[in-house]
A protein has these predicted regions:
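Cytosolic, long alpha-helical scaffolding segments
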Residues: 1-214
């Protein structure tokens, strides 16, 4: 019985890794489409969100099956409960990647008013946070989970840079206001992705220690 249970837990971890990979690719595709102003790629990124939603439902079903059929002990129950919480944040990350691509479509055909280097850096940092949070969950690595939580400040600082740059540009040239607002929303979605990655790591911390992060 325990062997079967451990096999199902390994399957859960594999499905979590798969969902994490899907979301990582979604962010990368959304940013690639944004930078290149590639509308076809942006549309593909939006369509990919359905697969992420499906993966969330698959993991939900697996977690509920584990609860109902295996009677998990306290530590395993925290692990499964954390997975259910984590996939909610993961699904929201997928939504935000899709939102970025929607904005790419809105800005298509118009040259950017600024370089996107800080936005690209934000995306890289959020991907690092996401991948590390999933690794922390699968490997029960409390130290790595804490490092992700601390890393959120890096993303927040980059967001502040983008925001301040865009506000200055609006003041200097109000005609750039519409695109500046769209780019600010892109940065805001990336900042939220960082927040969701932080939430994931906080649930990882709970699954390992049984304690919530202050």
């Amino acid at each position: 019985m325990r062997h079967k249970y451990e096999m199902q837990l390994r399957k859960l971890h594999a499905e979590m890794i798969e969902m994490g990979t899907m979301i990582e690719q979604a962010i990368e595709t959304a940013i690639k489409a944004l930078v290149a102003q590639d509308t076809e790629l942006a549309k593909k990124a939006i369509e990919a969100d359905d697969a992420i939603d499906h993966q969330e439902r698959e993991i939900e079903n697996l977690c509920l099956k584990l609860f109902l059929t295996q009677q998990p002990v306290a530590g395993d129950m925290r692990n499964i409960s954390a997975a259910l919480k984590m996939i909610t944040d993961m699904e929201r990350i997928g939504d935000h990647a899709s939102d970025i691509s929607e904005l790419t479509l809105c800005m298509a055909g118009t040259p950017y008013i600024k370089k996107l280097e800080h936005i690209q850096q934000m995306a890289k940092e959020t991907i690092v946070m996401l991948v590390s949070s999933i690794e922390a969950y699968v490997n029960a690595d409390e130290k790595k989970a804490k490092s992700v939580i601390e890393h959120d400040d890096v993303v927040d600082d980059l967001f502040d840079k983008v925001k301040n740059e865009l506000i200055t540009m609006i003041h200097e040239n109000p005609d750039d206001g519409e695109q500046a607002c769209d780019l600010l929303m892109v940065a805001k979605y990336l900042e939220r992705i960082g927040d969701h990655a932080t939430n994931i790591s906080e649930w990882v911390h709970f699954s390992i220690t049984g304690e919530h992060v202050d």
